[in-house]
UniProtKB/Swiss-Prot annotation:
SUPFAM superfamilies: Pseudouridine synthase, PUA domain-like. It comes from Burkholderia pseudomallei (strain 668). The lineage of its organism: Bacteria, Pseudomonadati, Pseudomonadota, Betaproteobacteria, Burkholderiales. The gene is truB. Belongs to the pseudouridine synthase TruB family. Type 1 subfamily. Pfam families: TruB-C_2 (PF09157), TruB_C_2 (PF16198), TruB_N (PF01509). It comes from the Bacteria. Keywords: Isomerase, tRNA processing. This is tRNA pseudouridine synthase B.
Amino acid sequence: MARRALDGVLLLDKPVGLSSNDALMRAKRLYQVKKAGHTGTLDPLASGLLPLCFGEATKFSQDLLEADKTYEATMRLGVRTTTGDAEGDVLDTRDVSCDEAAVRAALARFVGEIVQVPPMYSALKRDGKPLYEYARAGQTVEREGRTVTIRALALVSCALPDVTFRVTCSKGTYVRTLAEDIGEALGCGAHLTMLRRTGVGPLTLEHAVTLDALDAATQDERDARLAPVDALLSTFPCVKLDAALATRFLHGQRLKLSELAARPDAAEGGRVRVYDADDRLLGVARASEGVLAPERLVVTGA
């Protein structure tokens, strides 16, 4: 079957045990799409939302890479492992003497800006080599702490020694490390036993589909599962252009805001999504110094 020029966003519910790249390749084969990419790696041991971008949507995948993420996670108190999750060897065990009130208090202390030391079992590179390669060789290298932001952190359930929480966090946050640090704050250590991503920027797991469901579907049913390209941009203010302005915009011309029928509700230097009079997405622009400057164009008007 010939590859198709398909534009849109697939909200995939990735299963445990499959890498993000393997999930992307399976979806790409099912859709027979020419161009596809994912929006940030989800570890094989994690499940949940993995947005996949097809065609013109790939132009905006970076926006989701930078977006906040939401996860539901379960940690087991009293046990530390080499990897910070259930795959690692046990380092030590400690008594769990805290109660639910102490757990809630500990979670509250991690809301806001925090400093995390990246785990040794991670893909971050040192001298061109991923940290996990050093870790597998029994080596530990010095890592600098990185500032991340925990937007929200809520207790879902507490059945000690297991604690399930929901976290919304900035790009670059390691939930494994968060669980370990919470365990240390409680004086007993912890490791992650479950991780499920439920949100990426404005996108949620609620409308996601599994690979098994896609396997069983017809091509038309699969195509109907695709969200439009602008699903990635729903948090941006929008502006509509008449036919003449739309033509100029698609030729990369900067437009004076005074030429528009309605000025976009955007902060100075803010990004806006741009449509023509028929509500077709033309691209993304920046509104700055009285001018609407094209940033990325959608060539199909998808």
